[in-house]
Amino acid sequence: SSDSQGRQLVTPLSGRMYRELRHCLEATEFDRVDLLVSFVMRSGVNLIAARVDEALARGAHVRLLSTDYLMVTDVGALGFFLDRIGDHPSGSSLEARVFSDPSVSFHPKAYIFSSAQTGDGIALVGSSNLSHSGLRTGIEWNLRSQQIDELITEFDHLWRDERAVPLTVEWLERYR
């Protein structure tokens, strides 16, 4: 179901959440991928790892912003992103930051895909973490929207927040 503003409900149990995420990662028109996910689990990374690598191979710029809130995010899942940080021969890049403030709940989930050239894009925003449950089997609600400008602005705001620290080997060692 959708409305005139191009918003649609996307759920894991319908199969649509994973299908939409996979489609957006594969879509050659999207050269920017912004992942704002409170909890990143190895089970979720395993579902999208090959497509993240394909996006990087074709020149996409990928940013992950997660958190150490409640120590839920998986070390191995962050390791996948850490291994890919930096500039790649294709002109692509991957950056990752961790929002670290024990006094603040950090709980957003947004998967934002856009074209740097046209500004067009798709976002999936709702309750799905980057986990097998969040993408395939859990009871989660997400909206698919083509209205992404405000989301990108807010993502950039969080990205530049002083509490969003770069993911590094040293940071990950302390997190273990």
Please place each PLM-identified region on the residue numbering.
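PLD/PLD-like phosphodiesterase catalytic module centered on the HKD motif
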Residues: S1-R176
